């Protein structure tokens, strides 16, 4: 398969060269130029030469009468040349200062004087080699895409060939610009030229656009005064609207000039610009009740106190800040205690209520309470009244606190409260028996003071009771009081113990061996010490085996 490329019509068509020169001029001025070039680049001469490029067909994708698509290997070493004209800056100091900021430059007086010299550059001896994707269509023209950089070398001849430094500089800069031209701009130039040659509609449209541009350029005269004709909504200098009769009565000789008429819309925009944050934008959002430092002088600063604030940044008063922080702190503490100790829901309820109702003052009662050591009470309460008895301080805190607005109504928890609770005491009886601790529920409370006569609780001589299902230790904030207020009606109505069970009652006829009493007291003290040592040595009271057998009673 052979192809015949007719290169001579391109050389003979003058209109083709004119159009190609215009396209090349636009392409060379489109890309950013080096600062040494101070004028536009004009293509004054273009010649494709008599030697056509050599094409080697690598692949044909589509072949028809009106379309073609293929891949070629192109190589060109011909006599085409291109002549350019421009103006360059001969003073390098001027070029250096133009590319540096003014505040950092020395600003010389005479050494930086610009010196522009006309420059003529001729590009010749092109050597091209590369792979070309060619797509031809009579309706869409020719599309040429280079897969690689086709420029191998070229010769640059200029006015400064006698200066080696300038010659080398121009050679390097022009080669860089031509590589960009071949990869980006040349395919678009070839496509537009092909449309002008083969598509009549495109040619007609371009001719009409050229005529329109020429007419617009010729009709342009001196600038028209936009204020010569009155605006649509005229107002005077004071902002008062003017009607048509007032406008018609105005003349050039009158005291009110026509140029003093302004549009209401323009006045609003000027007012918005004045009220903006010293920016050039007409739509800068304004912030109410804000005093800007740039607006006030040092004398005006004292007139505006610091209390002038923006609604977007409200004042953070001490009460609001303290209420938010303390309430969140107490809520966090209450949640942590709720998760770690399920049986202390009543305590966490009171803690969260206390945190929600904060904010009445900076120094609340929580800071006034003394830190007390928590005492664990493992004895099961006798009655509901004793178990739910609360200390006077806790009751006063809960009852005297006013309801907070921020606190929402919370459900009532029926579980036994873990707030400071006064442990139930044994009923006051006339018997004085030594205390024998329960072996299946060891107590971790601090040892209270005992009199010389150790009182013996009647719990030790009762029958074994059912084990406590809830093994969670019950805590209290204070030890056993020495003197206890009279108990509830349930504790006062307990059945007195029979006389046979109380051998140590104050009876003159009772004969008790004091040696036996001392021996039993020593045995009880030894057992208490052993239990305490075992409790401290073991991992906890959870692993201890419950012993349901009560200790032996005295006198039996």
Curated annotation (Swiss-Prot):
Domain SMP-LTD residues, every copy: 1-195
Record flagged with keyword Signal: no
Biased composition (Polar residues): 299-333, 391-402
GO terms, molecular function: lipid binding
InterPro entries assigned to the protein according to its UniProt record, in alphabetical order: Mdm34, SMP_LBD
GO CC terms in record: ERMES complex
Membrane association type: Multi-pass membrane protein
Basic residues bias spans: 362-374
Cell location: Mitochondrion outer membrane
Positions with biased composition (Low complexity): 334-357
Keywords assigned: Lipid transport, Lipid-binding, Membrane, Mitochondrion, Mitochondrion outer membrane, Transmembrane, Transmembrane beta strand, Transport
Region (Disordered): 206-239, 299-423, 440-473
Basic and acidic residues biased stretches: 375-385, 459-468
GO biological process entries: mitochondrial genome maintenance; mitochondrion-endoplasmic reticulum membrane tethering; phospholipid transport
Subcellular location, principal: mitochondrion
General function of this protein: Component of the ERMES/MDM complex, which serves as a molecular tether to connect the endoplasmic reticulum (ER) and mitochondria. Components of this complex are involved in the control of mitochondrial shape and protein biogenesis, and function in nonvesicular lipid trafficking between the ER and mitochondria. Mdm34 is required for the interaction of the ER-resident membrane protein mmm1 and the outer mitochondrial membrane-resident beta-barrel protein mdm10.
Family the entry assigns: Belongs to the MDM34 family.
Self-association and partners: Component of the ER-mitochondria encounter structure (ERMES) or MDM complex, composed of mmm1, mdm10, mdm12 and mdm34.
Entry's free-text remark on domains: Lacks alpha-helical transmembrane segments, suggesting that it resides in the membrane via beta-sheet conformations similar to those predicted for other outer membrane proteins and porin. The SMP-LTD domain is a barrel-like domain that can bind various types of glycerophospholipids in its interior and mediate their transfer between two adjacent bilayers.
Protein name as annotated: Mitochondrial distribution and morphology protein 34-2
Species assigned in the record: Penicillium rubens (strain ATCC 28089 / DSM 1075 / NRRL 1951 / Wisconsin 54-1255) (Penicillium chrysogenum)
Chain's gene name: mdm34-2
């Amino acid at each position: 398969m052979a192809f015949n490329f007719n290169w001579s019509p391109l050389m003979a068509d003058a209109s083709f060269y004119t159009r190609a020169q215009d396209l090349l001029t636009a392409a060379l001025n489109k890309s950013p130029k080096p600062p040494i070039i101070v004028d536009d680049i004009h293509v004054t001469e273009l010649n494709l030469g008599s030697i056509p490029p050599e094409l080697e067909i690598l692949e044909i994708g589509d072949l028809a009468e009106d379309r073609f698509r293929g891949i070629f290997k192109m190589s060109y070493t011909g006599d085409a040349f291109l002549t350019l004209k421009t103006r360059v800056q001969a003073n390098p100091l001027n070029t250096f200062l133009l590319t540096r900021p003014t505040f950092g430059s020395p600003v010389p007086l005479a050494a930086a004087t610009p010196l522009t010299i006309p420059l003529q550059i001729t590009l010749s001896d092109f050597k091209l080699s590369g792979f070309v994707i060619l797509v031809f269509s009579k309706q869409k023209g020719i599309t040429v895409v280079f897969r690689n950089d086709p420029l191998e070398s070229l010769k640059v001849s200029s006015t400064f060939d006698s200066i080696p430094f300038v010659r080398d500089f121009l050679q390097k800069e022009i080669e860089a610009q031509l590589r960009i031209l071949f990869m980006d701009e040349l395919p678009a130039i070839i496509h537009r030229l092909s449309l002008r040659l083969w598509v009549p509609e495109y040619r007609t449209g371009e001719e009409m656009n050229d005529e329109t541009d020429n007419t617009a350029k010729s009709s342009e005269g001196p600038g028209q005064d936009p204020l010569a004709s009155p605006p649509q909504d005229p107002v005077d200098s004071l902002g008062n609207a003017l009607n048509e009769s007032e406008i018609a009565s105005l003349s050039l000789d009158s005291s009110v000039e026509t140029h003093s008429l302004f549009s209401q819309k323009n006045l609003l925009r000027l007012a918005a610009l004045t009220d903006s944050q010293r920016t050039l934008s007409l739509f800068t959002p304004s912030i109410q009740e804000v005093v800007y430092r740039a607006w006030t002088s040092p004398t005006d600063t004292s007139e505006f106190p610091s209390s002038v604030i923006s609604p977007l940044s409200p004042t953070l008063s001490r009460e609001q800040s303290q209420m938010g922080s303390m309430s969140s702190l107490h809520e966090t503490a209450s949640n942590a205690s709720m998760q770690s100790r399920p049986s202390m829901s009543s305590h966490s309820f009171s803690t969260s209520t206390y945190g929600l109702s904060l904010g009445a003052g900076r120094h609340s009662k929580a800071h006034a309470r003394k830190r007390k050591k928590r005492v664990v009470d493992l004895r099961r309460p006798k009655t509901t009244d004793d178990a739910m008895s609360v200390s006077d301080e806790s009751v006063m805190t809960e009852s005297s606190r006013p309801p907070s607005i921020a606190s929402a109504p919370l459900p009532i928890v029926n579980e036994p409260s873990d707030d400071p609770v006064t442990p139930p005491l044994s009923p006051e009886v006339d018997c004085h028996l030594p205390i024998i601790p329960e072996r299946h529920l060891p107590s971790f409370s601090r040892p209270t003071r005992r009199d010389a006569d150790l009182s013996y609780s009647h719990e030790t001589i009762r029958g074994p009771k059912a084990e406590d299902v809830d093994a969670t230790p019950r805590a209290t904030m204070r030890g056993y009081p020495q003197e206890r207020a009279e108990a509830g009606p349930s504790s006062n109505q307990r059945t007195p113990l029979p006389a046979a069970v109380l051998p140590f009652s104050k009876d003159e006829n009772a004969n008790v061996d004091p040696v036996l009493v001392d021996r039993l007291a020593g045995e009880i003290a030894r057992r208490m010490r052993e239990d305490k040592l075992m409790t401290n040595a073991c991992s906890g009271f959870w692993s201890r085996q419950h012993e349901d057998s009560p200790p032996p009673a005295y006198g039996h």
